[in-house]
Amino acid sequence: MRRVLEPELMTDEEQAQAYAQADFADVNQGFVDRFCAAFPDLTGGSLLDLGCGPADIPLRFARAIPGLTITGVDGSEAMVALGRQAVKDAEQDGRVLLLCARIPGLNLRPQSFNAVVSNSLLHHLPKPAVFWQEVLRLGRPGAALLVMDLHRPDSEERAHAIVEANAADEAPVLKQDFFNSLCAAFTLYEVREQLRAARLQAFRCEMASDRHWAAWGRLPKGAA
């Protein structure tokens, strides 16, 4: 199945609210656990979450690694508003900062983060190269990097089956977003080609579930 682009941002408040209320606990906690297992020596410093959504993952990192300060970035004002409320409710204002901004060209100091993570952002981007360029620009040499996203199935029928198997009870708007995201996602082969083009071919890149891939490693010295 060919890749079918979807809108880059969830700007609609109904979409954002449905996403925030959906049950991504297992996937999001699995993402944080994967990072902690891959980089057990990272116990503090600064972490950047690209495409942080309503801040569930930044807050999970704040709980998992008490020494971290976290900057979350999302291009959707509706998402960031929900995330800021979640951060306030969790009393993590001093450790978790959320910014509404888009890549490329984030107004953040180059090489300022010990770690960069991203879950389910890449498939929103028409040109994935800008994502990897921003990662290399913002992460310090040797920074830990974990990226996870959906894997594009080989047919629309398979995409519908994945939606029904994993989101049958979710709101219709979320189910449609899930289907669109599967159709816009990259295959494992395509991601490995992106890593090679970014000179990150030493990274591990493999399937993380029946519908997700994950890529992780440390940025090379002098990567920026």
Task: Show the residue positions of the predicted features.
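A conserved beta-strand element that flanks and buttresses the S-adenosyl-L-methionine
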Residues: V117
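A short glycine-rich, Lys/Arg-flanked "PGG" loop and its adjoining helix->strand segment in the class I
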Residues: V130-P141
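Conserved alpha-helix/loop element of class I SAM-dependent methyltransferases that forms part
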Residues: A25-G44
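N-terminal, positively charged/glycine-rich alpha-helical extensions of SAM-dependent methyltransferases
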Residues: M1-A18
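A short His-aromatic
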Residues: H123-H124
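Conserved beta-strand signature within the Rossmann-like core of class I S-adenosyl-L-methionine
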Residues: A143-D149
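Class I SAM-dependent methyltransferase SAM/SAH-binding core
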Residues: L48, A55-G105
